[in-house]
C-alpha cells in the first residue's frame, strides 16, 4: 500500500522521505520559501520561472525534470497538479479539458472514474515549486556570473578595465575574444551584456585593413551570435575597408569563419541604408560560390545560397556577374545532391539568373539542365516544380528543335501529364500545358506515346 505522510504545511505526498532523500526538495528551507505567499499567485510565478528557464535552454539544469512532475497528457511539467480518484495526477487545465469532452475514464489507466472531482495536490505543487526555484536561483547566479565575465572581457579589450590597463593585444586579445565568443554562444543573454558594455563599438573597430584573420574571425563570430546591432553599427560595418576584410576571410578563412562572414553580410543587407554595389564584387561572389560547392558542410551550402538569393533580389546588375563566374552550370550540377531545404533557394537563384540573356544562354548550354530539371518535377514542392518548369520553358523556347526532343527523351512528357492531372494550382497546370504544347509541336502522337512509355490503357 502507498504510504502517505502529513506535512506541517498541509497536504499529502507519496513517500515524502524518499523525495527528501533523493534531493527533489534540496533541503527544507526551500520548500518553505516556495510555499510562502499567496497560493493563487504561486502557479503564475512558477510558470514564469519555467518559461524563462525553457527559453534559456536550462529547464532542468544538470538534472532531468523528475518524472513525477510531468503531466501524462501534455508531457510538460505541471504548475497546478490535481489528482483523480484513481490516484493519477495531471495538470488541472489538461484534465479539465479531458473531462469537458465527456470522458469518464482516467487517461492513463483507462479506469472508470467513480468521482470526477479533481483534488488539488498542494504538496506536489510545493515540491515542483521548490525544485524549479532551486534551478531558477542557480540559473540566475550563473547568468550574473556570465554577464559579469563578459563585461570584464569587453573592458579589458577596450582598455577601460579597473584598475586602468592598456587594451589587450596580440594573443591575449585573440584569447579574450575567443572566450567572449564561447560565452555568447552558450548563453544568449550574454549578447545583451556585451552590447551594454560597449562591445558592439569595440568589435566594429577591430575590423579593418590591418586586422589579422584570427582577430577578425572571432569578432565576426560574436557579431552574428545575436548581439544587437543598431543602424550606426551596421553603417560602420559597411565601410569599404571592413567589407574588404569580410571578403578576404570569406575566401581564405576556415569554414565556420566563411559562414559567419556570409551571415554578417546578410544582416547588413537588411539595413535600409545598404548600398547594393557593396556586394557587386567578383571576389565576394567567387567566395560564396566556393562555399556553396563544398558539400561537406551543409550549413555553409545553405548560408551561401541564401546570400546569393538575396544578392539576386536586391542588386539586379549583380546577376550578370554571378553568371560570369560560372554559377549557372555549377548550381545545375549541384541540384540532385542538395538537401531538400536547399533545392528551392538554388532554383530561385537560377530563375533570377535566367532573367538576363547571359543566364538563359548558360542554362541552354549546360548539358545537365534538362535532365536535372525534369527530375525535380513533382519531387520536392509545388514551388520547386514551378521553378523547374520555368527553367525548361526557357531552354525549350530558346532552341525548340534541339531541346524539346531532349526533354521528351528525359521523361518530360509523362511528368507534364502528371502535373496537369495533379492537385497543383491552376497557374502551374497552365504552365505545364503550354510547355507540353511547345515540346509536342513537331512530335507525332505515336512518338509522344512511346517516349512517355504509356500503357495501352492510359493511351
UniProtKB/Swiss-Prot annotation:
GO molecular function: ubiquitin protein ligase activity
PROSITE patterns assigned to the protein according to its UniProt record, in alphabetical order: U_BOX
Bilayer topology term: Peripheral membrane protein
Stimuli inducing this protein: Slightly down-regulated by brassinolide.
Any single Pfam family the record assigns to this protein: U-box
This protein's pathway: Protein modification; protein ubiquitination
Residue ranges occupied by any U-box domain in the UniProt entry: 64-138
Record's GO cellular component terms: plasma membrane
Major location (coarse): membrane
Reported consequences of knocking out the gene: Dwarf phenotype with erect leaves and short grains. Dwarf phenotype is mainly due to decreased cell proliferation and disorganized cell files in aerial organs.
PANTHER family named in the record: U-BOX DOMAIN-CONTAINING PROTEIN 31, WDSAM1 PROTEIN
Oligomeric form and interacting partners: Interacts with GPA1.
Name the record gives this protein: U-box domain-containing protein 75
Protein's gene: TUD1
